[in-house]
Each structure stands twice: as structure tokens, then as C-alpha cells.
Amino acid sequence: KCDFEILMNTTSIPAHHEINMKALRAGKHLYSQKPVGLTVEEVTEQIEAAKAAGVKYTASPIHMLRDDIRFAKKLIADGCIGEIMKVHTNVCHGGPEYFQYRTADPTWFHRPGSGALYDMGVHGLTMTTGILGPAKAVGCMAKISEPVRTVRTGTFDGMQIQADQLYDNYIITLDYGERTMAVVESGFCQKDSRAPQMEIFGTKGTITFVNNGNI
């Protein structure tokens, strides 16, 4: 046994809520990987538990604390690119079975309670809404691009995963009314890409985010 003041929860997505609740009820400060819960009810329960325990509770993704995004928000506030017309965000990769360093079975990424939207989509949605605020309407198209996947490296190299239970390719649209809209691409269907992580298009100019933290 050991005592501690703060817990960092980096377990698999389906385990987040149970572990978070145990930590909060024990009076521990908490930093949780995303998503902290799979339903509004779970997240609300965690927030109320943190309030009751008087502890600090935060979660990833922390994009709005990034220097490049904070600088972009300042450029927008200063009117440097004019009125925002469109935001395009790309948060995709080829699937967790491609990770070079993986030593654990990645099957759970393709099972209910996980998937590309929870794993990757939250990044794009956080960045987009952090800049534009809440959307007035949201739409989505989704497909299963690879119903069977093969682990490429690591401990489970060569293992096949049945991946037909969840969508792995998403295009999410956000309507902000007037002239402004946003698109978030998310999924496990891009083995490689040179697409910018985010682009903000204004009436006077464009802000482009590249993957090394520069704009």
C-alpha cells in the first residue's frame, strides 16, 4: 500500500469512469485521459464527486493550453484574419495496431466503448470548439473502412482483429450559423498524411497548424 495526492489515469477508455470515481471518492486529485466517461451521466457523476471531495479534477486533451492555439486565438481576437468562415481539422492515423512501441493487445480500441471517435475525434472537437465555441448544429457521416485489421509490430505482430463493430472513419460537420462552419475528420483510416492538423480560414487570411507545433 502507498499513499498519494494525485492520480493520473491513463488506462483504457472503458475503464476510465470506474477508476476516476474510486479516486475522487477517496479524496484524490485527478488527471484523467480522455474521454473521462462514455455518457453525460457518467461525466456528471464524476464532476459532482470532485466537488463533494473538494479536489482538483482535470482531463485531456489540453489543446487550449498549447502555445500555438493560444497565439492563434490572439490573432483571431486582434482581427488579423478577419471573420472566420471555416475551420478544418484533421485528427487521424492508421490505427492503433500500427503503433511501433505497442506491447499490449490493441483489440479493445475496436470494441464498443472505445473507437476512433473517442480516441481521436475528441482532439479535433476540442480544438474546434475551443476556438469557435459551441456549435448550433452537428452532423456526422461514418464508415467502416477496414473490417479486419492486422497488428503490424510489437508483441502481437501478425494478430488479426475483427474490427467491424465500430466505425473507423468519421467526417463531422459543425454549423455556427451565419457564414461560419467547421469540419472535423477523425479515424483510423490514414496510414500517412501531410495534411495540416488544423486550418482556420478567415476573410483576410488563413492560419495553418503543422504537426510540429508551429503555425
Tell what function each PLM region has:
Residues K1-A49:
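Beta-loop-alpha module in the N-terminal Rossmann-like domain of NAD(P)-dependent dehydrogenases
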Residues N9, S32, Y57-A59, H88, ...:
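Hydrophobic residues in well-ordered beta-strands that form the structural core
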Residues Q33-P35, P61, Q190:
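Short beta->alpha connector loops at strand-helix junctions that form conserved
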Residues E45-I62, G82-K86:
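Rossmann-fold dehydrogenase core element
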Residues H63-A163:
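Predominantly a Rossmann-like dinucleotide-binding segment in NAD(P)-dependent oxidoreductases
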Residues T126-N214:
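Contiguous beta-strand/loop segments that form the cofactor/metal-binding neighborhood of enzyme cores
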